[in-house]
């Protein structure tokens, strides 16, 4: 069988696999096609006590066979199997007698190799769906005939390859294929993520029943491994750790304190001006109780006026650079993160200089986690993962330090929930370990900065589609080309539910002239927000359903919000000019304080994984005839429930969080001067990321 997409590319693949330095008898190899969830697959397999190793997709089949791997899992990825830049792979991986599970892109690869076809269809699936499964298939043994799974793809299997049968469907889309005699299985959905309710059962079926894994692999003590790495890397040098006061940097500092002598650790907390209310003071007090001496630096002025160097343009491939605007005049989320990251490093260098330390003898320690590196496409985590957003602690400058071996990141293979467990093992107090994550750039990335509205040529058509969806029961009586498009993107069951919802409730759905970051089909999306308002009391289950449905039909929408208050008669088509000024930050800081204070008092803080509060440049309720300028802003409450921060769902009022708690937040935030409306984010991840920027 010929090698796919370029034989020469495989001649040098395999590396350590070919020279015999490693042996993986009984282990599972995960071939990385560039999925955002590649490391999650690895983690789920290891949770089932099976050793797993991640290697490039182009690893040759003979190398996999020689090293004794028992089975192969192929991850998802952002490419199309027919794209010119589709990653190279060896099709012999399917014919060496090893059980194979192809996930998402991996399933499409498998189907294509055996003569099936894959097409880009009008329906894009991004979110949680009910699928029907054949539970007589070995992969789905023990499951119900209908299962809840995460789907995130644009391409779909069209013609199923000879020898394979369809074992799962999402409406009329193929969601699973199998060739039981050859032990080849494909899942269009993601069994590795928490949003797939019985994903662990599916992986267990593959590992134990199909591949015959023994389940004898236990991961060595994470704490001891981290301490060993710190000691080996640092030796007698000093380590500078930048403390945000969050779980990650605190656990990182506690590990450094345990691994090294106290005088080797320089703990610095930089108040960047984007902290929450009274945050810096509480950070210093909490860490002093742990015996960690912290140097607090007020650097708000340096951050507000910080700049960085950027490419001349996104299209310019030359090494030419330009100086960015100052941070307090920057609207681009990516530029904001880069400026903040580089300013952090500059201040760290200043601290080293003030303490008369030699830079070449000092390491920079960070509490960077695996999801951070995956989302910013760092080569440490994945050679292929598509960029979703730039993390403030994974900028070009820090990558350079990492290349020089001067950055130490002992938590780089941990996910958030694992860090909490490690923190408890280290003896950290529960109030620190269980606190909600807070991004390093702080409130700076929770302000949607804008000078102009985001309105592209697709705005009118998308707005019309949303009108049809919101009034579907009436729209079906008036034939329209866009109505046919809505029907083509939905199942009969979806249309039935949409009829029911729009018959019972008076809804209004429209685009908001702002954009937020999301993740769709393993790629970054930078798309519109859909707003929904109603004269009725919100039916939250129906709203959540609409939030799942709308991004499937409108691929240029990655987030859906409910707008509290009376129906929005005239959606805003302009924005309030918004930058990172002290007044804007003070408004958001107070809104964040009110919301989190109410959540803590309710006793539900532990049930919500994270709750970003976002300030948007939107001013509602203006009479267009009076030409009143946009001068107010609106707040978004983004509740988020997750086990790994790679995927997650919003807390549904009335289920995961009491309705009265949410309404109390709305009431208190509305009292803040300059606030127009309060919105509630209904979006799961994907298609929306945890943060809005």
Curated annotation (Swiss-Prot):
Residues 217-435 form the GMPS ATP-PPase domain. The modification N-acetylalanine is found at residue 2. Its EC number is 6.3.5.2. It is an enzyme of class 6 (ligase). Gene3D superfamilies: 3.30.300.10, 3.40.50.880, HUPs. SUPFAM superfamilies: Adenine nucleotide alpha hydrolases-like, Class I glutamine amidotransferase-like, GMP synthetase C-terminal dimerisation domain. ATP binds at residues 244-250. GO terms for cellular component: cytosol. Pathway: Purine metabolism; GMP biosynthesis; GMP from XMP (L-Gln route): step 1/1. The modification Phosphothreonine is found at residue 318. The modification N6-acetyllysine is found at residue 9. The modification Phosphoserine is found at residues 8, 332. XMP binds at residues 337, 522, 610, 685, 691. Residues 27-216 form the Glutamine amidotransferase type-1 domain. Keywords: Acetylation, ATP-binding, Cytoplasm, Glutamine amidotransferase, GMP biosynthesis, Ligase, Nucleotide-binding, Phosphoprotein, Purine biosynthesis. Its main location: cytoplasm. One of its GO terms (molecular function) is GMP synthase (glutamine-hydrolyzing) activity. Homodimer. Catalyzes the conversion of xanthine monophosphate (XMP) to GMP in the presence of glutamine and ATP through an adenyl-XMP intermediate. This is GMP synthase [glutamine-hydrolyzing]. It comes from Pongo abelii. The gene is GMPS.
């Amino acid at each position: 069988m010929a090698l796919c997409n370029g034989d020469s590319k495989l001649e040098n693949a395999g590396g350590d696999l070919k020279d015999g330095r490693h042996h993986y008898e009984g282990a599972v190899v995960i071939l990385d096609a560039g999925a955002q969830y590649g490391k999650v697959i690895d983690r789920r397999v290891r949770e089932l006590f099976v050793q797993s190793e991640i290697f490039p997709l182009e690893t040759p089949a003979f190398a996999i066979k020689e090293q004794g791997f028992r089975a192969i899992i192929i991850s998802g990825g952002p490419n199309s199997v027919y794209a010119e830049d589709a990653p190279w792979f060896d099709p012999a991986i399917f014919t060496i007698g090893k059980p194979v599970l192809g996930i998402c892109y991996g399933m499409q690869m498998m189907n294509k190799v055996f003569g099936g076809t894959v097409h880009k269809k009008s329906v894009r699936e991004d979110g949680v769906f009910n699928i029907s499964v054949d539970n007589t298939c070995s992969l789905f043994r023990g499951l119900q005939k209908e299962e809840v799974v995460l789907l995130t793809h644009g391409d779909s299997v069209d013609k199923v390859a000879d020898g394979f049968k369809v074992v799962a469907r999402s409406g009329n889309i193929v969601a699973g294929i199998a060739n039981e005699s050859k032990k080849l299985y494909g899942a269009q959905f993601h069994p590795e993520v928490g949003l797939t309710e019985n994903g662990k059962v599916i992986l267990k079926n593959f590992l134990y029943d199909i591949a015959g894994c023994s389940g004898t692999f236990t991961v060595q003590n994470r704490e001891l491994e981290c301490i060993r790495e710190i000691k080996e890397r640092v030796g007698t040098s000093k380590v500078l750790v930048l403390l945000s006061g969050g779980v990650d940097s605190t656990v990182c500092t506690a590990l450094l304190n345990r691994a090294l002598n106290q005088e080797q650790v320089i703990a610095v907390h930089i108040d960047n001006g984007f902290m929450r209310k009274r945050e810096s003071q509480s950070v210093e007090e909490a860490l002093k109780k742990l015996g960690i001496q912290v140097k607090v630096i007020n650097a708000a002025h340096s951050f507000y006026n910080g700049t960085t160097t950027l490419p001349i343009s996104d299209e310019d491939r030359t090494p030419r650079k330009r100086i960015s605007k100052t941070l307090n005049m920057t609207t681009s989320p990516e530029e904001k993160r880069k400026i903040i990251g580089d300013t952090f490093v500059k201040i760290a260098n200043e601290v080293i200089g003030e303490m008369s330390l030699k830079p070449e003898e000092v390491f920079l320690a960070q509490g960077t986690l695996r999801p951070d590196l995956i989302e910013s496409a760092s080569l440490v985590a994945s050679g292929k993962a598509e960029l979703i957003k730039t993390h403030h602690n994974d900028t070009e400058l820090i990558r350079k330090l990492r290349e020089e071996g001067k950055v130490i990141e002992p938590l780089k293979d941990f996910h958030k929930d694992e860090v909490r467990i490690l923190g408890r093992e280290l003896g950290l107090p529960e109030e620190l370990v269980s606190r909600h994550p807070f991004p390093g750039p702080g409130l700076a990335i929770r302000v949607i900065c804008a000078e102009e509205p985001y309105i592209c040529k697709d705005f009118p058509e998308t707005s019309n589609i949303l009108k049809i969806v919101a009034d579907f029961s009436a729209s079906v009586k008036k034939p329209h080309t866009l109505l046919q498009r809505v029907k083509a993107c939905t199942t009969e069951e979806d249309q039935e539910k949409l009829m029911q919802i729009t018959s019972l409730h008076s809804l209004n759905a429209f685009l908001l002239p702002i954009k937020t970051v999301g993740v769709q089909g393993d790629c970054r999306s930078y798309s519109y927000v859909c707003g929904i308002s109603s004269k009725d009391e919100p039916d939250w289950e129906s709203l959540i359903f609409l939030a799942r449905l709308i991004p499937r039909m409108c691929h240029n929408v990655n987030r859906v919000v409910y707008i509290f208050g009376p129906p929005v008669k005239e959606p805003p088509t302009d924005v309030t000019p918004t930058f990172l000024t002290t007044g804007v930050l003070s408004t958001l800081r107070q809104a964040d304080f009110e919301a989190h204070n109410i959540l803590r008092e309710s006793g539900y803080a532990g049930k919500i994984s994270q709750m970003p509060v976002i300030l948007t440049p939107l001013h509602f309720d203006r009479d267009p005839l009076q030409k009143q300028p946009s001068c107010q802003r609106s707040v978004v409450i983004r509740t988020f429930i997750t086990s790994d921060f790679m995927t997650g769902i919003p807390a549904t009022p009335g289920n995961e969080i009491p309705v009265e708690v949410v309404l109390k937040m709305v009431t208190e935030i509305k009292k803040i001067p300059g606030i127009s409306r309060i919105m509630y984010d209904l979006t799961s991840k994907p298609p929306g990321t945890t943060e809005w920027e």
